[in-house]
Design a protein with these regions (language model features):
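C-terminal motif of bacterial Sec signal peptides marking the signal peptidase cleavage site
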Residues: 14-17
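A generic structural micro-feature
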Residues: 139-143
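Short beta-alpha junctions and helix-cap segments that line functional grooves
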Residues: 134-137
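A non-catalytic structural micro-motif
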Residues: 77-86, 101-132, 145-152
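Periplasmic peptidoglycan-binding/tethering modules of Gram-negative envelope proteins
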Residues: 19-80
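Bacterial N-terminal signal peptides that target proteins for export
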Residues: 1-7
Length: 152
């Protein structure tokens, strides 16, 4: 009798394991980055602005990105950010640290002028120490002359 019951249970278990039905998810399906996250900033707004050689003046494309960043920061008012100024590999270490700081400050000042509280923004300069593009050519240098905004 126990063997019949055990055999029946085993057969039912085998049949259930072979089911063609897909498992159904009961949780929400993620369709993108978490709202208000660094990934959200990158995907929907843009996290970096670029500068011309030896300049810290904001270009028109940089202003457009910073406008979007300001709106995003107003929406996500609990988020603080750090803006890191960067340079290409040309120039001395001291010159590039100072230029990177001026670039970070230019981005910060624009955001503050658009209504983002200055207390929510910190700045730092990495000079030429943290390139985002490798290479010793104009394409790489242009990518490395930037200010990058990171959610903190």
């Amino acid at each position: 009798m126990n063997i019949k019951i055990l055999g029946t249970v085993a057969a039912v278990a085998l049949l259930a394991a072979c089911s063609n039905q897909a498992a159904t998810s009961t949780g929400p399906v993620s369709s993108g980055p978490v709202p208000g996250s660094q990934e959200d900033l990158v995907a929907n707004v843009g996290d970096r602005v670029f500068f011309d050689l030896n300049k810290n003046a904001l270009r028109s494309d940089a202003r457009i990105t910073l406008e979007r960043q300001a709106a995003w920061l107003q929406k996500w008012s609990a988020n603080n950010v750090q803006i890191a100024g960067n340079c290409d590999e040309r120039g001395t270490q001291a010159y590039n640290i100072a230029l990177g700081q001026r670039r970070a400050n230019a981005a910060r000042d624009f955001l503050v002028a658009k209504g983002v509280a200055a207390t929510r923004i910190t700045t730092i300069s990495y000079g030429k120490d943290r390139p985002t593009a490798l290479g010793s050519n104009e394409l790489a240098w242009a990518q490395n002359r930037n200010a990058i905004t990171s959610v903190r």
